Amino acid sequence: MLWALMCVALISIYLMKVGEMWGTNITRANEDELLRRGDAIRAAIDSYVRAESNGAFPRSFDDLLHDPRVSYPRRHLRAVYVDPITHGDWKLVTGPNGELYGVYSDAEGVPLKRDGFSDADVSFSLQTSYQEWKFVVYPSNGMVRR
């Protein structure tokens, strides 16, 4: 009888560890997806700004899906991605006149990832919250105006 109780206890401990590892793997996968989607949105904003000589920023995601400045279909973003951490809408980083500069997650968790970021995201290694991971294109980033 004692032997059976010890086996149940060991199996319970093992299953708890497996659950922790599984949760960590899911969190890491969601972080990777957050970086991928955020970088894609930032690249779309940059593409929109660079596509015309006036360097105007988009007003919304709709402008990225179909550029209203041209009469033919020009897409900078194929779809509006949801935030993979919250599974909801992104929070927007906007300019003084409502221009869309970028996005960030509204998730309150602490990121697991601390290094190995791309050059565009290297500042994320110092951030302590997903809300601080901002995928932004600012006009003052030395962007070349054509």
Predicted regions and their residues:
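Ca2+-coordinating acidic residues in Ca2+-binding motifs
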Residues: 9, 40, 63
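Hydrophobic faces of stable alpha-helices that mediate helix-helix packing
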Residues: 12-15, 38, 42
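Transmembrane signal-anchor/signal-peptide helices with a preference for the extracytoplasmic
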Residues: 13-29
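Membrane-proximal amphipathic alpha-helices
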Residues: 27-38, 54
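N-terminal single-pass transmembrane signal-anchor helix
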Residues: 1-18
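Low-complexity, acidic interaction segments enriched in glycine
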Residues: 43-146
